[in-house]
């Protein structure tokens, strides 16, 4: 699609009452996305823009998004370069992701939320106290770093969480995910041909709590299903 059409889609989604514009794995299209976002914002786009990424991105790419993206959803998949080389062919993953996430946090600052019916924004501490309320509370600005547990990689998951807590504390949210879904084609990695057990997940959550985590999202059972994998079928384009 053209940049002009992409800008139109952003505005159409806003008209349909979307809560945000979610750009998923858009790194290879950032120049076009930047121009489309500017066009859409000039045309009245006001809902938050979310950038959803593996974090294996050049810092200069992230810098081009400053002022256009409100919420970053980066992964932090690994610390261990042997794991990132084995499963993602990227021995430099952690170093690259480190720098990219640092830039994202610099741009957004601490997380902010909007509460339906209230004029002011609230911050993490108040959100954590109120997140069980019936009122709709939506993030408007900030970074949520996601970490997906992999079978047999609990030690690296602990290293990921420890790094994020030591580096950012309450400046970010951490989403600890148990939704790894083994699919066909894993014959080269038989150790990954299973789901994360409840015990494995609970051990990592306990570790995060022991390390003092307060800004976190966790998952309950039933998430490791193919239904959670989007259908990229061009609907709406």
Please report, for each region that a protein language model flagged, where it lies by residue:
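Alpha-helix N-cap and loop-to-helix initiation/capping positions
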Residues: 1, 28, 88-96, 152, ...
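Conserved Radical SAM active-site core
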Residues: 1-71, 80-81, 119-125
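Aromatic/hydrophobic pocket-lining residues that form the small-molecule binding cavity
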Residues: 6, 33, 97, 101, ...
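A cross-family glycoside hydrolase active-site/sugar-binding cleft signature
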Residues: 22-26, 50-54, 75, 144-148, ...
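Conserved radical SAM core fold
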Residues: 30, 55-58, 76-94, 143-144, ...
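Non-cysteine beta-strand/loop elements that form the S-adenosyl-L-methionine
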Residues: 66-80, 173-180
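Glycine-rich S-adenosyl-L-methionine
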Residues: 90-109
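Auxiliary Fe-S-binding modules of radical SAM enzymes
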Residues: 112-237
């Amino acid at each position: 699609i053209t940049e002009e059409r992409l800008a139109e889609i952003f505005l159409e989604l806003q008209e349909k009452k979307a809560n945000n514009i979610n750009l998923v794995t858009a790194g290879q299209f950032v120049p076009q996305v930047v121009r489309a976002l500017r066009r859409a914002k000039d045309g009245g786009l006001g809902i938050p823009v979310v950038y959803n990424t593996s974090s294996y991105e050049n810092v200069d790419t992230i810098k081009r998004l400053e002022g256009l993206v409100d919420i970053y959803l980066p992964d932090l998949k690994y610390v261990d370069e042997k794991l990132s080389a084995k499963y993602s062919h990227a021995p430099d993953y952690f170093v690259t992701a480190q720098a990219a996430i640092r830039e994202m946090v610099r741009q957004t600052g601490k997380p902010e939320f909007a509460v339906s019916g209230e004029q002011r924004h609230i911050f993490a501490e108040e959100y954590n106290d109120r997140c069980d309320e019936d009122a709709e509370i939506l993030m408007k600005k900030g970074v949520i770093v996601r970490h997906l547990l992999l079978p047999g990689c609990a030690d690296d998951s602990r290293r990921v969480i420890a790094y994020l807590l030591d580096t950012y504390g309450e400046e970010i949210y951490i989403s600890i995910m148990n939704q790894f879904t083994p699919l066909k084609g894993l014959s080269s990695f038989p150790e990954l041909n299973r789901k994360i057990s409840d015990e494995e997940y609970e051990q990592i959550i306990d570790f995060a709590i022991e390390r003092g985590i307060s800004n976190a999202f966790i998952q309950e059972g039933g998430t490791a299903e193919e239904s959670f994998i989007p259908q990229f079928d061009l609907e709406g384009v």
